């Protein structure tokens, strides 16, 4: 049996960044939990991170990412540099290489996807999503982005609602965090 599921989305708009995730944890064909929290604030609330994949692996990756951000002696928060450093370690370290998860990290200026294959992707649009319902949420978000009246949080929330209607591994118990 394997764990499946999760949809996480990050949106930037109007000087604000929102990250949202559904709450469903599925094991095989069974929903084990409907209110899991898959996003976290890091570095005193200045960075948002979300994960898709194994929970224990994600916690390890959150900790490693935060270490990379804090490793700069000048105190500057550079999530791009930290993401590249984490991706290098994740790909080359024998223990980290076995971790099965994907991460989204975001601050007020950047949104990044980090994968275990060493990819660090910064989207062209200020939208990115991961997980089983990621493509549904992403498509919905691109459409919602055309409505200039919607905030980053509104778009993230509405996009996850769409994904929850289509993806059996995504529910509508949404946790949303926002920073500016």
Swiss-Prot record:
Assigned EC number: 3.4.25.2
Gene Ontology cellular component annotations, sorted alphabetically: HslUV protease complex; proteasome core complex
Broad class of enzyme this protein falls into: hydrolase
Name assigned to this protein: ATP-dependent protease subunit HslV
Regulation affecting activity: Allosterically activated by HslU binding.
Known catalytic reactions: ATP-dependent cleavage of peptide bonds with broad specificity
UniProt xrefs under SUPFAM superfamilies: N-terminal nucleophile aminohydrolases (Ntn hydrolases)
Disulfides per UniProt: none
Positions with a binding annotation for Na(+): 164, 167, 170
Record-stated family: Belongs to the peptidase T1B family. HslV subfamily.
Domain of life: Bacteria
InterPro entries associated with the record: ATP-dep_Prtase_HsIV_su, Ntn_hydrolases_N, Proteasome_sua/b, Proteasome_suB-type
Summary of subunit composition and partner proteins: A double ring-shaped homohexamer of HslV is capped on each side by a ring-shaped HslU homohexamer. The assembly of the HslU/HslV complex is dependent on binding of ATP.
Keyword tags: Allosteric enzyme, Cytoplasm, Hydrolase, Metal-binding, Protease, Sodium, Threonine protease
Biological role: Protease subunit of a proteasome-like degradation complex believed to be a general protein degrading machinery.
Organism encoding this protein: Borrelia hermsii (strain HS1 / DAH)
Any matching Pfam family: Proteasome
BP GO terms, sorted: proteolysis involved in protein catabolic process
GO molecular function: metal ion binding; threonine-type endopeptidase activity
Active site positions: 6
Subcellular location: Cytoplasm
């Amino acid at each position: 049996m394997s764990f499946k599921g999760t949809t996480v989305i990050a949106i930037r708009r109007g000087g604000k960044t929102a990250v949202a995730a559904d709450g469903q944890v599925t094991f095989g064909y069974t929903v084990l939990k409907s209110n899991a929290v898959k996003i976290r604030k890091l570095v005193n609330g200045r960075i948002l991170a979300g994960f898709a994949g194994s929970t224990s692996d994600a916690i390890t990756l959150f900790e490693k990412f935060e270490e990379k951000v804090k490793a700069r002696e000048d105190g500057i928060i550079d999530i791009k540099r930290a993401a590249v450093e984490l991706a290098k370690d994740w790909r080359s370290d024998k223990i980290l290489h076995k971790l099965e998860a994907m991460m989204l990290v975001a601050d007020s200026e950047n949104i990044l996807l980090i994968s275990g294959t060493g990819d660090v992707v910064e989207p062209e649009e200020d939208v990115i999503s991961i997980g089983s319902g990621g493509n549904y949420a992403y498509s919905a978000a691109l459409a919602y982005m055309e409505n200039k009246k919607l905030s980053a949080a509104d778009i993230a929330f509405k996009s996850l609602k769409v994904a929850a209607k289509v993806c059996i591994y995504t529910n509508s118990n949404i946790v949303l965090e926002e920073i500016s």
